[in-house]
Amino acid sequence: MNLQMIGTGNAFAKKYFNNNALIEQDGFKLLIDCGITAPLALYELGIGMEELDAVLVTHTHGDHVGGLEEYGFQMKFKHGRRPVLLLPEALVDPLWQNTLSGGMTQEGLEKLEDAFDVRALRVGDVQELAPNLCVELVPTSHIAGKKSYSLILNRDVFYSADMTFEPELLTTLVRDRGIRRILHEVQLEGPGAVHTTLDELLSLPEEMQSIIKLMHYADNKEQFVGRTGKMEFLEQGLVYPI
């Protein structure tokens, strides 16, 4: 399984695209989140949106879903098909009603299922997306009153959505679930009201830090190189075997 971060930036980053990830397994391409910058990020990597086999949404903030309108329109009007959209069942209605309907509603496009081949995912299920690729939702805390879901990929890789610090969850995943790699969002400075701070992650045991890769960072990331303990930054555009 290969990981390519088409973007590694937080919602306000300008040097980096939105934190969205391309997972490829045996030719199957899964995009985790499709933020505002995703269409341009894919273009600059030479990847057409029509090459994606599915998009999976973790939560409904713009840096994670803001590119879905263009994706849906491109696929409908240029390629004549509804693309596969995977998302937690609790997000199906809010994604359309609160985010996409204003820009996408027109004759023949009156609900999410008109634009996308919607595949609702349930918490607790391990969903096989393709041969040798499965995903499990993990509810995690981000914004009060807004649901957000991190992911377990192929049973042993934890991919964090935007989330506050949950050390007990991370410990349980590693100790009891056999997680061998953690791809974790990070807020480099300030208090972690809705994100996990670097200082919080540095409080983890070094053994756990050594399996963590950092993403969703700010434009001043270069100032923190060498200051992340045993953790390393994921770099935008590079392909990592995971």
Swiss-Prot record:
Zn(2+) 1 binds at residues 63-64, 162, 216. It comes from the Bacteria. Counteracts the endogenous Pycsar antiviral defense system. Phosphodiesterase that enables metal-dependent hydrolysis of host cyclic nucleotide Pycsar defense signals such as cCMP and cUMP. This is Anti-Pycsar protein Apyc1. Homodimer. It comes from Saccharibacillus brassicae. It catalyses: 3',5'-cyclic CMP + H2O = CMP + H(+); 3',5'-cyclic UMP + H2O = UMP + H(+). Its cofactor is Zn(2+).
